[in-house]
Amino acid sequence: MQIVAVCGSMREESNTNKLVRIIAETSGIDCEFIELGKLNIKPCTGCSVCMMNEGECPIDDDMQAAYDKLLAADGFIIGGPTYFMDISGAVKNFTDRTMALKYRDIGPAYNEDMPWLGTAPFNDKPTVLVVTTAGGYHDRAIESLKLAYDDCHRVRIVDQVAEIVGMNDVDDIPEALERAKAAGKKLSSALQS
C-alpha cells in the first residue's frame, strides 16, 4: 500500500510541507513525496490533446514522471499554501495537469457519446487536503481543492487540515500539529478498511 503526498509549497521547510509530512508519517503508510518546489511543471495549455490521445499529455516536463506515481497510489495527501486568496499557482498547475489522467486507456474522449467526461482513476481513494495561510482565505483554497479532487477526480476526502498560522512556524502551534496527526490516523484507517 502506498500514498502520494503532494507538497505544494515552493519553500522546502514551509508550514504546508511540514504538515503534509506529519500526516504522512502518522499514517504509517509508505509514502512517495512529490515536492512541487523542486520540479519543473508547466501549466496546462488547454490543447485537449490528452482527450484525443488516451490521456497522453504532450508537455515534456517533470509532470510526466508524476503520472505513474499518481495512478499507482492507494491514497493521497494534497497540500498547498494560500497565496493571494486562493491555492498557490504551483498546486493549481499540478492539479490542472492531473486532468490528463481522466483520459487514460479510454480512446478518444471527445465524441458525441462521451464529450469531455473521461474516467475517474482516483475514484474513492482516501485523500487528505492541507492548506496553510498567513492571514485567511484558507476556506476558499480548500474549496478549490475539493472542486478538483472530490467533484472531478472523485477521491474520498477523509479529512482536511486548513490552518491560519500567521507568520509563525507551525512547529510552535500544537493544535495544528495535533490536527495533522489526527488526519494521518484517519487516512491510515481509511486505507486499511
At which residue positions do the language-model features occur?
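N-terminal beta1-alpha1-beta2 submodule of the flavodoxin-like/Rossmannoid cofactor-binding fold
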Residues: 1-104, 167-193
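Hydrophobic anchor at the start of a short beta-strand
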Residues: 31, 156-157
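Beta-strand-loop-alpha "switch" segments that mediate conformational coupling across diverse proteins
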Residues: 158-163
